[in-house]
Every structure is written in structure tokens, then in C-alpha cells.
UniProtKB/Swiss-Prot annotation:
This is Probable glycine dehydrogenase (decarboxylating) subunit 1. Keywords: Oxidoreductase. The glycine cleavage system catalyzes the degradation of glycine. The P protein binds the alpha-amino group of glycine through its pyridoxal phosphate cofactor; CO(2) is released and the remaining methylamine moiety is then transferred to the lipoamide cofactor of the H protein. The gene is gcvPA. The glycine cleavage system is composed of four proteins: P, T, L and H. In this organism, the P 'protein' is a heterodimer of two subunits. One of its GO terms (biological process) is nucleoside metabolic process. Transmembrane segments: none annotated. Belongs to the GcvP family. N-terminal subunit subfamily. It comes from Thermococcus gammatolerans (strain DSM 15229 / JCM 11827 / EJ3). It is an enzyme of class 1 (oxidoreductase). Its EC number is 1.4.4.2. Gene3D superfamilies: Aspartate Aminotransferase, domain 1 (3.90.1150.10), Type I PLP-dependent aspartate aminotransferase-like (Major domain) (3.40.640.10). GO terms for molecular function: glycine dehydrogenase (decarboxylating) activity.
Length: 448
């Protein structure tokens, strides 16, 4: 292992001579010595030695199959049919980057067209782009879009306080440069959006955003009414929805949404430590809205010979048109994630998606019922996936005690919402087993 393949020493010496330096140290002599550190890497190893070392390190991890996990709060453990991974790993789909001559990749464009078509049916809105980075990005882009639709005359965007801190951070980061004011509406005693406070906040706003199930997991019962309040104030109505709940709940379009957003990666994609993801972005059939959509839209047409062809119908990003006219600076989308979502959704079909939603709802209700035996559920109502649980002891201590018993507890939200005290979100999906819930409750009886 004594040879220098990288960096190539001969090439390095040649480059140094060309720019008039004798050594690398001389080249970086203006860097203060106190900031320099020794770069002491160990010697090289064989591939087998590296394999053994990495395997030993990775074996310390515990997957959601090996260790009962009740973590949720935006990242959930769903079952993915085996063929989804097989199909997206085919070379026709698994590419390094979005092609700059996309019409060459007819298979990829058709897959994205199918994704758009299925999401349009699912969200009840006819026009869907080929994905954003994630749910939070979709909300932020929707906020900017509502301002553009008002020609900059309205610069306020209303969101619920009971929203994921990560989504909120993305929204604030995205909109800061546009001088957009983000207005938060608190929850009422039921844990849902406070309608009276919304009526006060909506005045002169560009858009109003609400989620069909908020960060606490509570299903919002007044989505249609919230939309009516937004429209009466002249604001656009943006609805966020988890696609796995849309087999059993009304679609955002049916509830009056002008724009709908969501997280496509909940279908067909593993947790992956939180990413990559794919944001859903859909609008109603209004040319004014379609022209202001971010991202890219795949369309179906006929070529010069009359054959069916898939093309990028709209791609209003800054690399393709004048920057001042661009609707977004997103340079790529999450095409592979979107294709995986489309494959999973096509596998489920309407009946399978309904059954998936019913199982999640049933498992969430069972988890809530059992958790109420050992702790307080702050809000009553219908929950989907997440359930808030309030404890008397510091939750950090409880969480560590659960880990010691081989159980991953919920996500502590007291740090984001101090008014909720020692509260954590515990999540259930179709993968949650009753024996896991039983083990959790027995453990909590000891440590909580």
C-alpha cells in the first residue's frame, strides 16, 4: 500500500511549479498556524479488513424490526413491498442526476407522469408537479406562490402553531429573503386550530395553511370551515395531508384547497435517517395557479410522427428561463423517491390504500387507549399515527429507561412546546405490533 494513487505526487509537484510554490505548506502559509491540525490517517487496509471493520460498526445499529420503536413526529416505519426496491434499482431509473435532455428518458418521464396522475387523484386536485424536496419545502414554496399570486401586495402567510418544528424552520428559511411574515395561529383546548384566533390572523394574508392531521396527530375536523374563512379574506387555501390517510379521509381538493402539499416518501421509501424525501405539490385547474407552480410538470403529447411522447411541459426554474421569471430555484427534484412512491401506490390500489389507512387508524387508537392507562393524553379526539403523552417525570429519564429495556420511546416535544410540559409523541403505523405496545406499557408502568 505504499504507492500514491491519490493524490498523484508528480502531478502535484507540476502544479506547484506552475504557480510558483515550492511546497503545499508554502501555498497555505497565510493560514494561521493555530488553526492547522495534523492529518494523521491510519495506513491503508485491504477491502476485506475494511468490510470487517464497517460490519462491526454497523452491527451496533438496531433497526425498527429488531427493536420496538414508537418514534414518529414526521418520520415513520412503513412496510415496503420487496419489488419496489428492485424496480427503482434498475439502471433505467437509478441515475446520478436529472437528465438535461429528459425526453431521451421516456421511461423515467412516463413513471413521473404516472406519479403525478396518481397523486392528482389522491389529493383531489388535477395538476401535480413531479415532486419537491420534501413536505416542508412544498409548504414554503406554496407560501411564496401565494405572495406571487397577489403580486406582492400581501406578504403574510398563516400557519398553525401545532406544526413540525422542522417544517417551520424550512418555511422561515425559505421566506426570510422574500420578507414574508409568518403568522402562527395557536391551538384551542381541543388541540386543534383555534378558529376565532384564525379569523383575527387571516386579514390581509396571502395564504392560510392547515394540516389534515396536525403535529400532535390530531385529525383536524374543521378543514372545510378553515378554507371558507381563508377565501372570505381573499387568501389562498393550502392543505397539507399525509398520503397514507387519503384512502379513508376526504381529499384536500374536496375540502376546498387551492394548493395541496404532502410527503410522498411515506409510500415506497424507507426512513433513511430522515431522507431523501419527496414533497407533493398539487393545485386546482386554474391557469393562473399552474403558471406560478414551482418545480417541473411532466406532460403527455404526440411527436412529429404521431407517436405518444412524454415531455417536460413546464419547467419554470432559473436554469431554464430568466431568473426574474423563475418560480423556484430548486435545481432538481426527488425523481427516484417519487417513482418509488408511484410503484407502491400502484401496488396498493384504491382498496389497498383504504385498508392501509384503516389499519394505521386502528393501531393508533389502540396505542392511545393503552397509553392512557399509564399517562395523560392532553387532548381528546381522533388521532392518526402520532399520539401526545404527558408524563409526571422528566421524559428524558423515561426515554433512557425505555432504551435500557430495548424499547425506543416517543419523540420529546416539550422542548419545542414548553406549555405542554413533559410530553412526547408516540407513533403507530401498520407495522406496529400489539406485543410491542404491551411491552411498552409494561415498561412504562415501571419507569414512568
Amino acid at each position: 500500500m505504499g504507492k500514491h494513487y491519490l493524490p498523484n505526487l508528480a502531478h502535484r509537484e507540476e502544479m506547484l511549479r506552475e504557480i510558483g510554490f515550492a511546497s503545499i505548506d508554502e501555498l497555505f502559509s497565510d493560514v494561521p498556524e493555530g488553526m492547522l491540525k495534523e492529518f494523521n490517517l491510519p495506513g491503508g487496509k485491504s477491502e476485506y479488513e475494511v468490510f470487517i471493520e464497517l460490519n462491526e460498526t454497523l452491527s451496533k445499529n438496531k433497526t425498527a424490526l429488531e427493536m420496538p420503536s414508537f418514534l414518529g413526529a414526521g418520520t415513520y416505519f412503513h412496510y415496503i413491498p420487496a419489488h419496489v426496491k428492485y424496480l427503482i434499482e434498475r439502471s433505467e431509473f437509478l441515475t446520478a442526476y436529472t437528465p438535461y435532455q429528459p425526453e431521451i428518458s421516456q421511461g423515467m418521464l412516463q413513471a413521473l407522469f404516472e406519479y403525478q396522475s396518481m397523486m392528482a387523484e389522491l389529493y383531489g386536485l388535477p395538476v401535480v408537479n413531479s415532486s419537491m424536496y420534501d413536505w416542508g419545502t412544498s409548504i414554503a414554496e406554496a407560501a411564496l406562490m401565494t405572495v406571487r399570486l397577489h403580486r406582492g401586495k400581501r406578504k403574510r402567510f398563516v400557519i398553525p402553531k401545532a406544526i413540525s418544528p422542522e417544517k417551520k424552520a424550512v418555511i422561515e428559511t425559505y421566506t426570510r429573503g422574500a420578507n414574508l411574515e409568518i403568522v402562527e395561529v395557536p391551538w384551542d383546548e381541543s388541540g386543534r386550530l383555534d378558529i376565532e384566533k384564525l379569523k383575527e390572523a387571516v386579514e390581509d394574508s396571502a395564504g392560510v395553511y392547515v394540516e389534515m392531521a396536525n403535529f400532535f396527530g390530531l385529525v383536524e375536523e374543521n378543514v372545510r370551515e378553515i378554507g371558507e374563512i381563508a377565501h372570505e379574506a381573499g387568501a389562498y387555501f393550502v392543505v397539507g395531508a399525509d398520503p397514507t390517510m387519503l384512502g379513508i379521509f376526504e381529499a384536500p381538493g374536496e375540502l376546498g384547497a387551492d394548493i395541496a402539499v404532502g410527503e410522498a416518501s411515506y409510500l415506497g421509501n424507507p426512513m433513511n435517517f430522515g431522507g431523501p424525501r419527496a414533497g407533493v405539490f398539487a393545485v386546482r385547474n386554474d391557469k393562473k395557479l399552474i403558471r406560478q407552480m414551482p418545480g417541473r410538470i411532466i406532460g403527455m403529447t404526440r411527436d412529429a410522427e404521431g407517436k405518444r411522447a412524454f415531455v417536460m411541459t413546464l419547467q419554470t426554474r432559473e436554469q431554464h428561463i430568466r431568473r426574474a421569471k423563475a418560480t423556484s430555484n430548486i435545481c432538481s427534484n426527488e425523481a427516484l423517491v417519487a417513482v418509488a412512491s408511484a410503484i407502491h401506490l400502484a401496488t396498493l390500489g384504491p382498496k389497498g390504500l383504504r385498508e392501509l389507512g384503516e389499519v394505521i387508524l386502528k393501531n393508533t387508537a389502540y396505542l392511545k387507549k393503552r397509553l392512557s392507562e399509564v399517562a395523560e393524553i392532553p387532548f381528546e379526539g381522533l388521532y392518526f399515527k402520532d399520539v401526545p403523552v404527558k408524563f409526571k417525570r422528566p421524559y428524558g429519564e423515561i426515554h433512557e429507561a425505555l432504551l435500557a429495556k430495548g424499547i425506543h420511546g416517543g419523540y420529546y416535544i416539550g422542548k419545542h412546546f414548553p406549555e405542554l410540559g413533559e410530553t412526547a409523541l408516540f407513533a403507530a403505523t401498520e407495522t406496529t405490533r400489539k406485543e410491542w405496545v404491551h411491552a411498552l406499557i409494561e415498561a412504562l408502568k415501571e419507569v414512568a
